[in-house]
Amino acid sequence: GGHCNELVAERIGKTILLESNGHFRSYARAHFEYDLGRDSLINSSFSTEKNEAGSSDEAVARLVAKWRAATEVELSALLGFSSREYLANDDRLQRAVVESWLQIDSAAAIAINNRLALRAPLPQGEVTLADIVGLLPFENTIYAVELSGAEVLQVLAAGQSPFVTGLIRTENDWLLAKTGRLIDADQTYRVLINSFMYEGGAGYDAIAKFDSAGFDTEIHYRQPLVDWLLDQDSSANKPLTLP
């Protein structure tokens, strides 16, 4: 499953595995016959099918058109105006995302995001909600976890492409941005991450082991950036420049 887009329909032991490939080119399906009275499976079959020579259903097409129009109105909302384009891997854009997270939780000292969470650039000129959805396209929320300094350092060392704010990297150490002091291996820090990381994605499986009671803020991981952009009140006459 996951992101491999491999067309699969097969049985392994008593389990049927199904997966379609990308862009709705095909699908996998299974058929089950079940005896409810005897609470038993009578028969099962599975197959893969290609989407060929299909035609749209008018009722479905109208429904899709209705919601597409409504979505386009929402996504066209203007959030600001950027002085230049910032690529997804640009530290300035990465920093803007994680620093916006810290603004929703004054008790948090550190925020960590995986770099690949950003999937599109911030464009030059008008910035709309659609641009931010493209930038942060996944349905992740922000988690708050309690980690010791030693655990924070382990997460940064083991995770895939971390971008961190609240800490300053020196040649050999990490300093707390608020105090300028070395991170204390034994002290507990409140750290903000995204739910994908808490679930173990991109090599961050240690986080949930360190704090099995992580708090899901239920705040979408792109919302703080949206709010921050609106707060900047940027325009063509006063364009946004990321530090």
Q: Where do the language-model regions lie?
A:
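Short, charge-rich amphipathic segments
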Residues: 29-42, 79-95, 151-163, 219-222
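Feature captures C-terminal
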Residues: 96-243
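Active-site-adjacent helix-turn-beta-strand microarchitecture at beta-sheet edges
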Residues: 1-74, 163-164, 169-177
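Intrinsic-disorder/low-complexity, polar/charged segments enriched in Ser/Thr/Lys/Arg/Asp/Glu/Gln
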Residues: 29, 74-77, 142-144, 188
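Short Gly/Pro-enriched turn/cap motifs at secondary-structure boundaries
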Residues: 20-23, 88-92, 133-134
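Hard-cation-handling environments
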Residues: 44, 54-127
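A near-ubiquitous, low-amplitude feature marking generic local secondary-structure context
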Residues: 15, 50, 54, 58, ...
